[in-house]
Each structure stands twice: as structure tokens, then as C-alpha cells.
Amino acid sequence: MTTFGTPLSPHATKVMLLGSGELGKEVLIALQRLGVETIAVDRYENAPGQQVAHHARTITMSDPAQLKALIEQEKPDLVVPEIEAIATGMLEELEAAGTVRVIPTARAARLTMDREGIRRLAAETLALPTSPYVFCDSLEELQTAIDSKIGYPCVVKPVMSSSGKGQSKIALPKDVAPAWDHAMAGGRVSRGRVIVEGFVDFEYEITLLTVRALGADGQVETHFCEPIGHLQVSGDYVESWQPHPMRPAALEKSHEIARAVTDNLSGQGVFGVELFVKGDEVWFSEVSPRPHDTGMVTLCTQWQNEFELHARAILGLPVDTALKSPGASAVIYGGVDAAGIVFDGVADALRVPNTDIRLFGKPESFVKRRMGVALAFDADVDVARTHARLAASKVRPRAAG
């Protein structure tokens, strides 16, 4: 796109986001700053992104008929999936018919909607290094896979889930049945199927934000952000920092793996490529064809954060992945199960040097639901991490009243 219309006019450039959580909210804001008319879609009303979009729509996005009807009604120029639980088959059908352009592509949305599609692409089609794995449809198959191939310890994850839900570590035979039950409770849509992975002896894991954007000649170019280190607990991100130091050879291999995966998925936009690293060895873990939760740190570290990069790339605009300052992020959890919570300690959090916070505006809190994030920058990334954790600890969510 080189010409942009005026929002809420007959010539508006319209973008529809499928999924309107905290990441989608930031993408919507970035799009609006470029004069784009936005449509925020989610499965529940008053989702964070719906609070800032021009239009808010609530449907079951995994229902093909509902999804098709909404796209045909709104007639967006671009459809941007921000979550996995979407009727991707319908997106492929509409894209093939020329009804809409899907970001990055409908095929990429389908392959990355669950762990099976993308793992088979990476390991079997592209021959990239990954952990050993088996897909299982029952507790019996899971036990057989562990006994015959994977061994202990191992990790079990639902084929489809988000933010670490349903993921657990199996150390001993007695852990297998509880892990299966936990995966069934935490999975989305593809209930009854899991991936069991052998442990990779890695030193650290990173997210490599990889951006496919048009160059001056109109051809797609690949750009890399500085590697993002992150800490996960039970598969859920709790802290991230940028840059994470890496050996030159490991960084080069990371670029090669990320380029191979994103070239195959094709299209334009930001891809969050997760990798395990030990010394100069690198293993592919997962990829999301959209901004990544660990990439929220870029709100304080890059001249163009991951959401601005995504907005620019999908609109065909130039991007800049340069680092502005080292920095860190730390998650603010809900801490309570309640609707319409309030937050104490915000002023105290912002008194921590070089910090900022984002409160997501989710209408309902759960004990382990991400309700906000603290950000901090500093020339020393370890200082930034300390400040981000401190700021996050000072924000105290509670039930209202």
C-alpha cells in the first residue's frame, strides 16, 4: 500500500484484527497512528483492543460461518490474526477467492495455529534442529511415546494453547497421568491431542523478532531485532529483556533458522521465533506470525517497537529494527479472581527510575492472568531487569469495593 484513506470515510484503509488482547491493542494503536480504520474482533466484549478500535465486534472466531459473515460484512483490506483459535480453513478459502488478504498469509495462520503444523514444517520439511517429539491422542499413547522414544524428563503441551496453558514437566512415571489431565484442561479447540518433547540441554532461550517488510525495490527483505531473553514459569512468560548476549556463531545460526522458517511461511509482518541455545548450538522451538508477548519489552528498547514494526510491515512501509536502549519487562499478574479490579501502587511503581507501565484493561482478572506489564530501560540490562521487577511488584491489583 502506498496510498492511505481517511478513517470512517468511503476511502478508508481498513484492517481487521482477529483477537484483541494486550498485543492486539498495541497493534491497533500503531495502525491508528498511520491513519488506518480498525476493527477489533474477540470472543468476549470489551477486550483490550476493542476499547481503542474504531469498531468492536464479538464473535466465535473458530466458527467458519461467523467469521465469513463478519469479513464479508466489514470488507477489510487486511485481516490480521492475533491469536491461534481461528477458523483458518475459512481464511484460506476467502484468501483464495480474492475476498481478503490475510497477514502474513492464510497458510501461515493455519500452520502456526497449533504446535503440530509448525513443528512438522520445521523438523520434517525444513530439517531444522528441534527437540525430539511425538504427537499423542490418548494417555496410553503418551505413556508409550515416553517409554519407547522420549524418556524422562520431558515436557507435555496441548497441541493448541496459549501463554503456557496446559504445559507441564514430567520427571517420573507418576507424573504422566496428571500431565495429561492438565493438558486437556488447558488446551484450546484441539482437545485430546498433545505433543511430548524430550528435554533439550540448553543454556538459555530467546525470542528473535523477525520482520519481513518491503524494501525500496518492492521486494520482501528480512530484518532482525536484537535477541530477547526471557524467563518462563510453567511455559508462561514472566520477564523479558533485550538484548540478550549471544556468541556470534549462535546469533548467525539463529538468523539462519528464523529466515528459513519465515521465508517458508512468507508474507509480511513480524514473526516471533523462539529458540533454545547452548554455546554455538541452536534449536528451533516455536514461531508466532505476529508480535510476541516477550516482545513487549520493545516498547522501551527500540525506536520502532514490535507493534509499530508489524503495522508498518503489513502496510508495505519501511521498518527500522534498531535498538534505542537496553531494557526489560516484568509481568503484572491479576492476583485475584474478580471482574473490574482496581490497581493500587501505580504511582510508587512509576517512581522507580526509568520505568513505565501498561495496564491492559482486561475486564476480568484471574490469579495468573496477565493484567499489565512493567517496563524499564538502562544502559545495563541487569539494572533494567531489577527495576522492571521492582516496578511490577509495587502494582497491587485487588477486587473493587
UniProtKB/Swiss-Prot annotation:
Protein EC: 6.3.1.21
Q: What is this enzyme's catalytic activity, as reactions? A: N(1)-(5-phospho-beta-D-ribosyl)glycinamide + formate + ATP = N(2)-formyl-N(1)-(5-phospho-beta-D-ribosyl)glycinamide + ADP + phosphate + H(+)
GO BP terms, alphabetized: 'de novo' IMP biosynthetic process
Which keywords fit this entry according to its UniProt record?
ATP-binding, Ligase, Magnesium, Metal-binding, Nucleotide-binding, Purine biosynthesis
Source superkingdom = Bacteria
Q: Where does Mg(2+) bind?
A: E274, E286
Q: Where does N(1)-(5-phospho-beta-D-ribosyl)glycinamide bind?
A: E22, L23, E82, D293, K362, R369, R370
Q: Which GO terms describe its cellular component?
A: cytosol
Which residues are listed for ATP binding in this entry?
R115, K157, S162, S163, G164, K165, G166, Q167, E197, G198, F199, V200, E205
Q: Which InterPro entries match?
A: ATP-grasp, ATP-grasp_carboxylate-amine, ATP_grasp_subdomain_1, PreATP-grasp_dom_sf, PurT, PurT/PurK_preATP-grasp, PurT_C, Rudment_hybrid_motif
User: Key word RNA-binding present in the record?
Assistant: no
Single annotated GO MF: ATP binding
What metabolic or biological pathway is this protein involved in? Purine metabolism; IMP biosynthesis via de novo pathway; N(2)-formyl-N(1)-(5-phospho-D-ribosyl)glycinamide from N(1)-(5-phospho-D-ribosyl)glycinamide (formate route): step 1/1
Membrane-spanning segments: none
Which parts of the sequence belong to the ATP-grasp domain? 120-315
Q: Does the keyword Nucleotide-binding apply?
A: yes
Q: Which family does it belong to?
A: Belongs to the PurK/PurT family.
Q: What does this protein do?
A: Involved in the de novo purine biosynthesis. Catalyzes the transfer of formate to 5-phospho-ribosyl-glycinamide (GAR), producing 5-phospho-ribosyl-N-formylglycinamide (FGAR). Formate is provided by PurU via hydrolysis of 10-formyl-tetrahydrofolate.
Give the record's subunit note. Homodimer.
Q: Which NCBIfam families match?
A: PRK09288.1, purT
Q: What is this protein called?
A: Formate-dependent phosphoribosylglycinamide formyltransferase
- Which organism's genome codes for this protein? Polaromonas naphthalenivorans (strain CJ2)
Q: What is the lineage of its organism?
A: Bacteria, Pseudomonadati, Pseudomonadota, Betaproteobacteria, Burkholderiales
